[in-house]
């Protein structure tokens, strides 16, 4: 069963001589419960696809179908600075009309699950970058969405913090059987996290290759299996860039 389906999707920004086509004729299926990493060079339209799936924008042509609801997590935590971690995580439930006691209990469980229990009463400026992203992950999970959309959520973090958050995300996704569409330009990150890696060409972005990830979990980003797959995918990306440069 498909959780996300894009058929012949194109997106153009602007009109006339200033028009820029970000993605062209994209076909993409994400199965329910699948973790798909969308990989490509900067500017290839990865974030555009995420915005289309999240219904933050509409395609110029083609169709986008999502089975259920979505939650979006960005590279920056986007936590409200005047709210505590607890209040930030409770907010989507409050907006959805969840009773106060229930949302407080659920938020507390989520905060503890991402190892922020002792920081629940802190505000974002009192947290490290990794802690803020943990809070953002808890808030995304609080929406109880069917599809989790992640736009380079760990791109600004140091390697050790990123690796820790990979473990935490992996545990949350497996426990909740979430469907994830994860945008990254980090090949090893994609091999570490994904069930499948989808490669996009330089702009206008097109899906050019798909790699299943048959590596048993739990995975380590420095494992030989991850390194071997990352090398194969990197070769594909290099070919895409060279082909684009040759015109």
Stretch-by-stretch model annotation:
Residues 54:
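Helix-to-loop junction immediately C-terminal to a conserved catalytic motif
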Residues 123-127, 131:
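Conserved ABC ATPase signature
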Residues 94, 101-119, 171:
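Conserved ABC ATPase "signature" region
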Residues 83-90:
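Short coil-to-helix segment of the ABC ATPase nucleotide-binding domain corresponding to the Q-loop/switch region
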Residues 39-41:
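The feature captures the beta-strand-to-loop junction immediately N-terminal to the Walker
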Residues 137:
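Hydrophobic anchor residue at the start of the ABC signature
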Residues 142-146:
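A short, proline-enriched helix->beta-strand linker immediately N-terminal to the Walker B motif
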